[in-house]
Regions:
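Tubulin/FtsZ superfamily GTPase core signature
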Residues: 1-359
Length: 359
């Protein structure tokens, strides 16, 4: 009898959307067919939870809130999560990697997300927070709550990606409607999750396995740089590498990082020289002591494009801690995904390119 050889199981990756903002982000990911992950939506508001497209939905704090939400009070969100701590633990048990996503500043997401992250880390999961910071017009109280929630979350994640909503305005038309602006925020969250997840779930020419991702992201506790850039033509390698580390949303650069993953995706015409060029561009812009893990993969939908995805960690948190003491939008956070500054074409993996081409 011939037995099929098993070369290793794919990592179990779960994405937990907490509160209204997290739930919206989850719905956007499902609509855009993000693969290789399981989705969990957690909320105190039973009506909002019914709108979730997630396979796994959990109402927390039934006794505390009676299904009516947290009333923009993070302490209520926190207590609601603690009320269902064991159920949350059961949902996350057995995971290799857990993304915790929410919109910071409200009640459920701000209060419950740190609890979910703490449970995840205690279970031994690689835990990544991907959250947003409010628009300025949402008020000082909401901003203050958001900054406090971000610092609480930071204590319980391996890596944190924070997306300031105000910065998202840099990549959309000023006449964009409020609804579309919030949708774009959801898409940025989705791209961040998808960009990381696909590195470890999609087979490549030079694979980056989950152990590599864990080594770069585990226990860092800092805000991560995640950049995605696309290049075309003769100088596509240089163009993609530079776009990946220079974003209109970016407020940190790769120079302060100590660890990074660089993944290059292209059609079958990718050359060794192009991979070498990408790596040289990244190294020249970064700390000379940076430890880089690299990988490469094929995607036949790219039609001549070359994509570079960079995840960099190991930044000093000193300045970020000071931000909470003096809340300020201008001090904001770091980010992630970009559009080409010269036109309206998104830069990113094939799923992002195809999404644009459909419009």
């Amino acid at each position: 009898m011939v037995e099929q050889e098993t070369f290793g199981e794919k990592p179990i990756i779960k994405v937990v959307g907490v509160g209204g903002g997290g739930g919206n982000a989850i719905n956007r990911m499902i609509e855009n067919d993000v693969k290789g992950v399981d989705f969990i939506s957690i909320n105190t508001d039973s009506q909002v939870l019914r709108l979730s497209k997630s396979e796994y939905r959990m109402q927390i704090g039934k006794q505390l809130t009676k299904g009516l939400g947290a009333g923009a009070d993070p302490s209520v969100g926190e207590q609601a999560a603690l009320e269902n701590e064991e159920e949350i633990k059961d949902l996350l048990r057995g995971s290799d990697m857990v993304f915790v996503t929410c919109g910071m500043g409200g009640g459920t997401g701000t209060g419950a997300a740190p609890v979910v992250a703490k449970i995840s880390k205690e279970l031994g999961c690689l835990t990544v927070g991907i959250v947003t910071k409010p628009f300025t017009f949402e008020g000082k109280k909401r901003m203050r709550q958001a900054l406090e929630g971000i610092e609480k979350l930071r204590q319980h994640v391996d890596t944190l990606i924070v997306i300031p909503n105000d910065k998202v305005l840099n990549i959309i038309d000023p006449k964009t409607s409020m609804l579309e602006a919030f949708k774009e925020v959801d898409h940025v969250l989705r791209r961040a999750v998808q960009g990381i997840a696909e590195i470890v779930t999609v087979p490549g020419l030079i694979n980056v396995d989950f152990a590599d991702v864990r080594a770069v992201m585990k226990g860092k506790g800092t805000t991560a740089l995640m950049g995605i850039g696309i290049g075309q033509g003769e100088n596509r390698a240089v163009e993609a590498a530079r776009k990946a580390i220079c974003s209109p949303l970016l407020e940190i650069d790769i120079n302060g990082a100590t660890n990074a993953i660089v993944f290059v995706t292209s059609d079958v015409d990718i050359s060794f020289d192009e991979v070498n060029t990408v790596m040289n561009e990244i190294r020249s812009a970064s700390n000379s002591e940076i430890d880089i893990v690299y990988g490469a993969g094929f995607n036949m939908d790219l039609r001549g494009e070359l994509i570079v995805t960079v995840i960099a960690t190991g930044y000093d948190n000193k300045d970020e801690t000071e931000e909470v003491a003096t809340p300020s939008v201008s001090n904001g956070e770091k980010v992630v995904v970009q559009k080409n500054p010269s036109d309206d074409t998104p830069v990113g993996p094939s799923w992002l390119i195809n999404e644009f081409k459909k419009k």
